Amino acid sequence: MIGNILLNVRYLLAPILIIVAGAGVLIGGIMAWLGVVLLFVGLIVDIATKFETTGVGYDENGDTLGWASFQNLTMYFMLPVFILFQLVMAYRVYTFMALGGAEGAVVMEIIPGLLVMHEGITAMNLIGATLSSGIFIGIGIIYGHELSHTKGFGFVISRTMMALSGSAHFCYAHVYNHHLELASEDDPATAPRGRTIYGHYPLSYLGQSKFLFNMEKERLARMGVSFISWQNRWIRGYLMAVPTVALFFAAGGWVGMACLATIWGISNFELEALNYLEHYGLIRVKDQPIDYRHNWDNSTAFTSWFFIEIGRQADHHDRGETHFWELENVGCPNTGWGYFVVFFIALVPPIWHWYMRKRLAAWDTHFATDEEKAIANRINKEVGYEGTPFAGDVLQDAGNVDLGMRTAKK
């Protein structure tokens, strides 16, 4: 019983830390930087927990050990957490403007003599609050991703969460573009070899928005409805963000707008970073089946628990509507480290290319089809990946194992 409880509550890591980061913003002072500190703590923990883990598993009757109601309620709960986080940040913008950047009077002594909450916030700590908000609102987006694969109430929650994060196009573009065009030139979310994470961010974000724009244009034309219409899900999605924009503008005018733009910029950078890390450099010939090999998997402990198994990309792309706690490790190519580690590696492009080109060389040798190899050889010449040796990683031997690959549903 205790083991079953631990299997399920381990996925509360991110919600708890999101709430803690939000509390830091509310308290203000040096605590406004708590979210930034927690990001680096996450990196250390990710390094220390490189060991592999599994999903919740099944009992002797073949029934999942996952608590569906508990996990779904947790994901739904993240929407009010999102809203409260934004309200708290807007409050801090308001107090900054009202008191001219002074801390003002002590409102509450949380730990007498050690930790107090001031009425206002300094400019430096407002920067910390903004960065903390961007980081942990971005981390919370993983719940919007998970619910985008559901229908009904769950999808509405996802759509609202993504709209409040400045990424209203995501729910449709992710399901109807990324999951169908994965690792091909028609998928803006897949980063080709040689591209940096900084170059990928705007191209992926705008490319996915363009996809939904075009999809709605064609859909409404077939219906005989004007593009400028409430039925346009591209327009309607971005309008859902208007209350957030109004809130921050009312709180601090253009200072509020700058804070919101920074928060959205960071949170969406994290979202596109996940796309970048999960499929970087992988190649699929258009109209050929999507296979397990078209994903970089990860099943290290902290990444799996914190990011609710999002690292099991191969199984996720095969069974998109499967609950995250039921996803399995299917023996796919692996980047070797957890998401915190590879994210920080990706922030330094020369190190990232050095790190990944060796893994891509192994992928070309052990996983790619002849057609994919031909494309890879051409691209490798163009971006300077040609002739890269590979040694010293389990990926080298992975291609010699029968992975039992299934063709992903399209």
Residue ranges of each PLM-predicted region?
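Alpha-helical bilayer-embedded segments of polytopic membrane proteins, i.e.
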Residues: 2-50, 66-94, 105-136, 229-272, ...
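Cytosolic/stromal cytosol-facing helical appendages immediately following the last transmembrane segment
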Residues: 2-15, 155-232, 266-410
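Transmembrane helix-loop junctions in multipass membrane proteins, especially transporters and channels
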Residues: 30, 51-55, 90-98, 146-150, ...
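Conformational gate/switch positions in structured elements
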Residues: 40-44, 146, 254, 280, ...
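C-terminal ends of transmembrane helices
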Residues: 45-60, 142-146
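Juxtamembrane helix-capping/reentrant segments at transmembrane boundaries
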Residues: 57-82, 290-300, 329-335
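Intramembrane catalytic core of multi-pass membrane enzymes that act on lipidic substrates
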Residues: 60-205
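Hydrophobic side chains within alpha-helical segments
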Residues: 148-149, 244, 275
